[in-house]
Swiss-Prot record:
Family membership: Belongs to the polypeptide deformylase family.
Protein name: Peptide deformylase
Cofactor binding mode and count: Binds 1 Fe(2+) ion.
Binding site for Fe cation: C92, H134, H138
Role according to the record: Removes the formyl group from the N-terminal Met of newly synthesized proteins. Requires at least a dipeptide for an efficient rate of reaction. N-terminal L-methionine is a prerequisite for activity but the enzyme has broad specificity at other positions.
Catalytic activity: N-terminal N-formyl-L-methionyl-[peptide] + H2O = N-terminal L-methionyl-[peptide] + formate
Length: 184
């Protein structure tokens, strides 16, 4: 198991269109495990393979309180079941510390396969429906800030840059404080 680096907005790789998974191989299963571990470590509820620079149609999510019920959707297809859209406040691991309302259908049908090749065909609503649509957007090169005004997109980009600089400095400070090995 390994933590994977998460791409940050506005990295152009986030705009790449994911290709379908032809077969659930051992490598795909390892990627799934690593994505779930990465999602938990980053305290997220969903992660698309595109966000970790693997441009295949694969998403993982876990909306459970105890973070013990991960779901895997391979080659997901979503169909809205209602015309009306509802606003939900969304955030994204690729757009750290930025949250804003996005309107999406509250009820959808999700068709996919799981990590064992079993078919998934479910009607879902609420946060699960929103999360699935958000992650599928990533597979299509769409980021939630694309739904926002130009001004909010610019603010999001600036905020992400600041957050990443702060994290980089904190990482350097942590590295400086770690004990250095003694010369023998």
């Amino acid at each position: 198991m390994a933590l994977l680096p998460i791409l940050s907005y506005p990295d152009p790789r986030l705009r790449m269109i994911a290709t379908p998974v032809k077969e659930v191989t051992a490598e795909i299963k390892t990627l799934i495990t690593d994505m779930i571990e990465t999602m938990y470590d980053a305290e997220g509820i969903g992660l698309a393979a595109s966000q970790v620079d693997h441009h295949i149609q694969l998403i993982v999510m876990d909306l459970s309180e105890d973070k013990d019920s991960p779901r895997v959707f391979i080659n997901p297809k979503v169909t809205p079941l209602v015309e009306e859209k509802q606003p939900y406040e969304e955030g994204c691991l690729s757009v750290p510390d930025v949250y804003d309302k996005v309107e999406r259908p509250n009820k959808v049908r999700i068709e996919a396969i799981d990590q064992n090749g079993n078919a998934i065909d479910e009607e879902v609503e609420g946060l699960l429906a929103v999360c699935i649509q958000h992650e599928i957007d990533h597979l299509n090169g769409v980021i939630f800030v694309d739904y926002l005004s130009r001004l909010k997109q610019t603010r999001a980009r600036d905020k992400v840059r600041k957050v990443l600089k702060i994290r980089e400095k904190q990482g350097e400070q942590v590295a400086e404080k770690e004990p250095q090995p003694a010369n023998s």
